[in-house]
Amino acid sequence: MAVPTNSCLLVCLLTLTVLQLPTLDSAAPFDVTAPQEPVLALVGSDAELTCGFSPNASSEYMELLWFRQTRSTAVLLYRDGQEQEGQQMTEYRGRATLATAGLLDGRATLLIRDVRVSDQGEYRCLFKDNDDFEEAAVYLKVAAVGSDPQISMTVQENGEMELECTSSGWYPEPQVQWRTGNREMLPSTSESKKHNEEGLFTVAVSMMIRDSSIKNMSCCIQNILLGQGKEVEISLPAPFVPRLTPWIVAVAIILLALGFLTIGSIFFTWKLYKERSSLRKKEFGSKERLLEELRCKKTVLHEVDVTLDPDTAHPHLFLYEDSKSVRLEDSRQILPDRPERFDSWPCVLGRETFTSGRHYWEVEVGDRTDWAIGVCRENVVKKGFDPMTPDNGFWAVELYGNGYWALTPLRTSLRLAGPPRRVGVFLDYDAGDISFYNMSNGSLIYTFPSISFSGPLRPFFCLWSCGKKPLTICSTANGPEKVTVIANVQDDIPLSPLGEGCTSGDKDTLHSKLIPFSPSQAAP
């Protein structure tokens, strides 16, 4: 019976050996390992996650996949010797990359830049060689130390003090403690910990101080994961609640009121004296500056007797007084459609053209609350609503509503010392200078940046609303004459002489909405 038994044992051993051969052959020819301890990274820093490949050989041409929960959520895919950005999750594009140098030594290091709270969790690296693959897991922990704590104090009517400690930018949720100067911990009365869209926590912790013997309190906020924290200390004021009789309180209030009245009277008298002294100095200084300007900065300009050109006037503009006044009406005139006539903006040009020299004229605006005055190139576009800016050949200032503006590309707001009733236009063609003055007080309204003119320039006028008194060009009394003005005059220096060629305008209020003006807005 022994021989059959030994034969049976031999057959069983051979069978087991044969069954194990396919299993051994099917095992992957490499292993993938990863550190067991989590990798810790601070918010905003860079994190490196590494897994190893053994036997220690080059894995440069193998397929490598770093992923989170499933293989379809690729943090990084390395295939055919390069990273496949098209397969990468959106939140990791531009932040996750592979240290390719380690692949030659059998290491795969994933570099995540600008770490966020949402990056925390498990990452798996998978190596694939043909049909063989192995994977390992690495865990990333994220932490952040927040801002320095701030303590605010509120004293209650009963003498108790409420302290509130606030700080932001922590992760994970921090631990907050109140401590006395003797390092004794006290409980909080309320505590709030909220996280923002980035996942970082903001804490606000309050407590009440009822023990008057406590001199100092500190707020300590700790990140348990990092073993780091921040602390701030505040000194508490000594309690002082004096017992006062009613008559002492009344006397104190009366004395305090008398003291305030005395101080106020002294301060008011001193301020009034300083203001009067300043005004006297300013008046004296203005006279001195005027004399100096008269001696050093006189510019002689030729006063022009400007008249309006009816061939350029918009059909709603009516000219009066030998083409020296213009008014905007609701009715539309039947006029020849000339190339030089404005058909959209309610504008008109002067007859005079300037190609050189220095020129000057005045316009009476009176109490009108809407107008535009200046110069323009003779060949400006007069059809349609092209913007009236220097780029399009217009240099003008305007009043619309309660605002004064220079018609620059972005419309420059002007701050004037007072509303001008008469505006002087100063043109120095050769110097490329256009300036506007308030002839009522001699102050400068606006000067356009210097420009090199080319081609003829003409006076330019525009009105925005109907039914008001005309805009009037001031006439020279006895023909063209020389007028002396101050160059770059200050706001508080009067300009002289002003001329007497016009009367004041009307006092109507603005009611029209003709910006932009279109012929379709008024019936003929």
UniProtKB/Swiss-Prot annotation:
Residue ranges crossing the lipid bilayer per the database entry: 248-268
Subcellular location: Membrane
Glycosylation site positions: N56, N216
Keyword Lipid metabolism among UniProt keywords: no
Domain B30.2/SPRY: 286-480
Signal peptide (UniProt feature, chain positions): 1-26
Positions of disulphide bridges: C51-C125, C165-C219
Extracellular face of the membrane: 27-247
Topology within the bilayer: Single-pass type I membrane protein
Tissues/organs with expression: Strongly expressed in lactating mammary tissue (at protein level). About 100-fold lower levels in virgin mammary tissue. Also detected in spleen and thymus at 10-20 times lower levels compared to those detected in virgin mammary gland. Very low levels in several other tissues, including brain, heart, kidney, lymph node, lung and small intestine. In the thymus, detected in the stroma, in epithelial cells (at protein level). Most prominent in medullary areas of the thymus and at the corticomedullary junction (at protein level).
Highest taxon above the source species: Eukaryota
Statement: the UniProt record of this protein carries the keyword Transport: no
Quaternary structure and interacting proteins, as annotated: Seems to associate with xanthine dehydrogenase/oxidase.
Family named by the database record: Belongs to the immunoglobulin superfamily. BTN/MOG family.
Function recorded in the entry: May function in the secretion of milk-fat droplets. May act as a specific membrane-associated receptor for the association of cytoplasmic droplets with the apical plasma membrane. Inhibits the proliferation of CD4 and CD8 T-cells activated by anti-CD3 antibodies, T-cell metabolism and IL2 and IFNG secretion.
Name of the molecule in the record: Butyrophilin subfamily 1 member A1
Lineage: Eukaryota, Metazoa, Chordata, Craniata, Vertebrata
